Protein backbone atom coordinates (compact mmCIF):
# COMPACT_ATOMS: atom_id res chain seq x y z
CA UNK A 1 0.00 0.00 0.00
CA UNK A 2 1.50 3.35 -1.07
CA UNK A 3 0.89 6.49 0.92
CA UNK A 4 0.09 9.86 -0.69
CA UNK A 5 3.64 11.26 -0.35
CA UNK A 6 5.13 8.17 -2.09
CA UNK A 7 2.70 8.60 -4.99
CA UNK A 8 3.35 12.35 -5.13
CA UNK A 9 7.14 11.94 -5.20
CA UNK A 10 6.82 9.28 -7.92
CA UNK A 11 4.93 11.82 -10.05
CA UNK A 12 7.57 14.58 -9.75
CA UNK A 13 9.33 14.79 -13.14
CA UNK A 14 13.09 14.46 -13.42
CA UNK A 15 15.11 16.64 -15.78
CA UNK A 16 18.46 15.73 -17.29
CA UNK A 17 21.18 18.33 -17.61
CA UNK A 18 24.47 18.04 -19.47
CA UNK A 19 27.48 19.09 -17.39
CA UNK A 20 31.23 19.00 -17.98
CA UNK A 21 31.29 15.73 -16.04
CA UNK A 22 28.43 14.16 -17.99
CA UNK A 23 24.71 13.95 -17.35
CA UNK A 24 23.09 14.94 -14.09
CA UNK A 25 19.44 14.45 -13.16
CA UNK A 26 17.39 16.75 -10.93
CA UNK A 27 13.81 16.61 -9.78
CA UNK A 28 11.97 19.52 -11.39
CA UNK A 29 11.70 21.54 -8.15
CA UNK A 30 15.45 21.32 -7.48
CA UNK A 31 16.15 22.42 -11.05
CA UNK A 32 13.82 25.41 -10.68
CA UNK A 33 15.49 26.28 -7.35
CA UNK A 34 18.68 26.87 -9.38
CA UNK A 35 16.69 29.58 -11.19
CA UNK A 36 15.69 31.04 -7.77
CA UNK A 37 12.11 29.76 -8.05
CA UNK A 38 10.40 28.26 -4.97
CA UNK A 39 7.02 26.52 -5.04
CA UNK A 40 4.62 26.88 -2.12
CA UNK A 41 1.99 24.30 -3.00
CA UNK A 42 -0.74 22.77 -0.84
CA UNK A 43 -1.54 23.13 2.84
CA UNK A 44 0.71 25.49 4.81
CA UNK A 45 2.04 23.35 7.67
CA UNK A 46 5.20 23.09 9.77
CA UNK A 47 7.20 20.66 7.60
CA UNK A 48 6.44 22.55 4.41
CA UNK A 49 7.22 25.88 6.10
CA UNK A 50 10.62 24.61 7.25
CA UNK A 51 11.46 23.55 3.68
CA UNK A 52 10.41 26.95 2.28
CA UNK A 53 12.41 28.80 4.96
CA UNK A 54 15.48 26.65 4.24
CA UNK A 55 15.21 27.39 0.51
CA UNK A 56 14.86 31.13 1.13
CA UNK A 57 17.94 31.15 3.38
CA UNK A 58 19.93 29.05 0.89
CA UNK A 59 19.11 31.37 -2.02
CA UNK A 60 20.04 34.39 0.11
CA UNK A 61 23.43 32.83 0.86
CA UNK A 62 23.94 32.07 -2.86
CA UNK A 63 23.15 35.59 -4.14
CA UNK A 64 21.92 38.14 -1.58
CA UNK A 65 21.22 40.78 -4.26
CA UNK A 66 19.14 38.68 -6.67
CA UNK A 67 15.35 38.39 -6.45
CA UNK A 68 13.65 35.17 -5.32
CA UNK A 69 10.38 34.08 -6.97
CA UNK A 70 7.78 32.40 -4.75
CA UNK A 71 4.97 30.70 -6.69
CA UNK A 72 1.90 30.11 -4.50
CA UNK A 73 -0.94 27.62 -5.05
CA UNK A 74 -2.34 27.04 -1.57
CA UNK A 75 -5.65 26.76 0.30
CA UNK A 76 -3.93 28.16 3.41
CA UNK A 77 -3.24 26.42 6.70
CA UNK A 78 -1.39 26.98 9.96
CA UNK A 79 -0.88 30.60 11.05
CA UNK A 80 2.36 29.81 12.92
CA UNK A 81 3.81 27.91 9.95
CA UNK A 82 2.80 30.74 7.62
CA UNK A 83 4.35 33.36 9.88
CA UNK A 84 7.65 31.47 9.85
CA UNK A 85 7.69 31.85 6.04
CA UNK A 86 6.47 35.47 6.18
CA UNK A 87 9.06 36.56 8.76
CA UNK A 88 11.85 34.95 6.72
CA UNK A 89 10.64 36.71 3.55
CA UNK A 90 10.89 40.06 5.37
CA UNK A 91 14.17 39.18 7.11
CA UNK A 92 16.32 38.12 4.17
CA UNK A 93 18.16 40.57 1.93
CA UNK A 94 16.81 39.55 -1.52
CA UNK A 95 13.43 40.84 -2.67
CA UNK A 96 10.83 38.07 -2.72
CA UNK A 97 8.48 38.34 -5.70
CA UNK A 98 5.23 36.43 -5.15
CA UNK A 99 3.08 34.90 -7.91
CA UNK A 100 -0.36 33.33 -7.40
CA UNK A 101 -1.02 30.33 -9.64
CA UNK A 102 -4.37 28.62 -9.12
CA UNK A 103 -5.33 29.97 -5.72
CA UNK A 104 -3.93 31.77 -2.72
CA UNK A 105 -6.42 31.45 0.13
CA UNK A 106 -6.20 32.35 3.81
CA UNK A 107 -2.52 32.16 4.85
CA UNK A 108 -1.65 31.67 1.16
CA UNK A 109 -3.20 35.09 0.41
CA UNK A 110 -1.34 36.65 3.35
CA UNK A 111 2.00 35.36 2.01
CA UNK A 112 1.10 36.55 -1.49
CA UNK A 113 0.49 40.08 -0.16
CA UNK A 114 3.72 39.89 1.87
CA UNK A 115 5.91 39.85 -1.24
CA UNK A 116 7.99 42.85 -2.30
CA UNK A 117 5.80 45.84 -3.25
CA UNK A 118 5.68 46.16 -7.04
CA UNK A 119 6.64 42.50 -7.46
CA UNK A 120 3.43 40.71 -6.40
CA UNK A 121 1.44 39.08 -9.20
CA UNK A 122 -1.57 36.92 -10.02
CA UNK A 123 -1.96 34.86 -13.16
CA UNK A 124 -5.22 35.77 -14.96
CA UNK A 125 -7.41 32.85 -13.84
CA UNK A 126 -6.13 32.54 -10.30
CA UNK A 127 -8.24 33.48 -7.28
CA UNK A 128 -7.46 34.90 -3.88
CA UNK A 129 -9.42 34.50 -0.64
CA UNK A 130 -8.99 36.35 2.64
CA UNK A 131 -10.76 35.63 5.93
CA UNK A 132 -10.21 35.67 9.67
CA UNK A 133 -8.09 32.92 11.30
CA UNK A 134 -9.95 29.72 12.16
CA UNK A 135 -9.86 28.04 15.55
CA UNK A 136 -11.36 24.84 16.85
CA UNK A 137 -10.57 24.01 20.47
CA UNK A 138 -11.78 21.44 22.95
CA UNK A 139 -11.10 21.14 26.64
CA UNK A 140 -11.87 22.94 29.86
CA UNK A 141 -13.76 26.23 29.65
CA UNK A 142 -10.78 28.16 31.03
CA UNK A 143 -8.48 26.71 28.32
CA UNK A 144 -11.02 27.52 25.60
CA UNK A 145 -11.17 31.11 26.90
CA UNK A 146 -7.35 31.37 26.72
CA UNK A 147 -7.36 30.09 23.12
CA UNK A 148 -10.19 32.47 22.18
CA UNK A 149 -8.15 35.43 23.48
CA UNK A 150 -5.11 34.21 21.57
CA UNK A 151 -7.00 33.88 18.28
CA UNK A 152 -8.50 37.37 18.68
CA UNK A 153 -4.98 38.73 19.20
CA UNK A 154 -3.73 36.90 16.09
CA UNK A 155 -6.70 38.16 14.08
CA UNK A 156 -5.94 41.79 15.02
CA UNK A 157 -2.23 41.38 14.24
CA UNK A 158 -2.88 39.79 10.82
CA UNK A 159 -5.40 42.52 9.98
CA UNK A 160 -2.85 45.24 10.84
CA UNK A 161 -0.25 43.58 8.62
CA UNK A 162 -2.71 43.12 5.73
CA UNK A 163 -3.64 46.79 6.07
CA UNK A 164 0.02 47.73 5.77
CA UNK A 165 0.61 45.52 2.70
CA UNK A 166 -2.58 46.47 0.83
CA UNK A 167 -2.95 50.13 1.79
CA UNK A 168 -6.54 49.45 2.88
CA UNK A 169 -7.71 51.06 6.16
CA UNK A 170 -7.80 48.68 9.13
CA UNK A 171 -11.59 48.93 9.46
CA UNK A 172 -11.98 47.85 5.80
CA UNK A 173 -9.73 44.83 6.37
CA UNK A 174 -11.67 43.93 9.53
CA UNK A 175 -14.96 44.08 7.63
CA UNK A 176 -13.70 42.20 4.57
CA UNK A 177 -12.04 39.37 6.52
CA UNK A 178 -15.07 38.75 8.72
CA UNK A 179 -16.23 36.02 6.31
CA UNK A 180 -14.62 34.18 3.38
CA UNK A 181 -13.96 36.89 0.79
CA UNK A 182 -13.09 35.61 -2.70
CA UNK A 183 -11.47 37.80 -5.35
CA UNK A 184 -10.53 37.39 -8.98
CA UNK A 185 -7.01 38.31 -10.08
CA UNK A 186 -8.22 41.77 -11.17
CA UNK A 187 -10.07 42.33 -7.89
CA UNK A 188 -6.93 41.32 -5.95
CA UNK A 189 -5.02 44.07 -7.80
CA UNK A 190 -7.75 46.63 -7.04
CA UNK A 191 -7.69 45.62 -3.36
CA UNK A 192 -3.89 45.96 -3.14
CA UNK A 193 -3.11 42.30 -2.39
CA UNK A 194 -1.03 42.14 -5.58
CA UNK A 195 0.39 44.74 -7.95
CA UNK A 196 -0.53 43.35 -11.36
CA UNK A 197 -2.10 40.51 -13.31
CA UNK A 198 0.66 38.78 -15.28
CA UNK A 199 -0.52 37.35 -18.60
CA UNK A 200 2.85 36.85 -20.30
CA UNK A 201 6.39 36.61 -19.01
CA UNK A 202 7.85 40.10 -19.42
UniProtKB/Swiss-Prot annotation:
One GO process term, biological-process aspect: protein quality control for misfolded or incompletely synthesized proteins
Q: Kindly state which keywords UniProt assigns to this record, in alphabetical order.
A: Cytoplasm, Hydrolase, Protease, Serine protease
A Pfam family name for this chain? Answer: CLP_protease
Active site per database record? 106 (nucleophile), 131
GO MF entries: ATP-dependent peptidase activity; ATPase binding; serine-type endopeptidase activity
Q: What's an example GO cellular component term for this entry?
A: cytoplasm
Say if the entry is tagged with keyword Cytoplasm. Answer: yes
Q: Where found in the cell? A: Cytoplasm
Q: What is its EC number?
A: 3.4.21.92
- Top-level taxonomic group: Bacteria
Which InterPro entries does the record cross-reference, listed alphabetically? ClpP (IPR001907), ClpP/crotonase-like_dom_sf (IPR029045), ClpP/TepA (IPR023562), ClpP_His_AS (IPR033135), ClpP_Ser_AS (IPR018215)
- Asked if Protease is a keyword of the record, the answer is yes
Into which EC class is this enzyme placed? hydrolase
Query: What is this protein's function?
Result: Cleaves peptides in various proteins in a process that requires ATP hydrolysis. Has a chymotrypsin-like activity. Plays a major role in the degradation of misfolded proteins.
Quaternary organization: Fourteen ClpP subunits assemble into 2 heptameric rings which stack back to back to give a disk-like structure with a central cavity, resembling the structure of eukaryotic proteasomes.
The Swiss-Prot or TrEMBL record describes its family as follows: Belongs to the peptidase S14 family.
Q: What is this protein called?
A: ATP-dependent Clp protease proteolytic subunit
Q: What gene does this protein come from? A: clpP
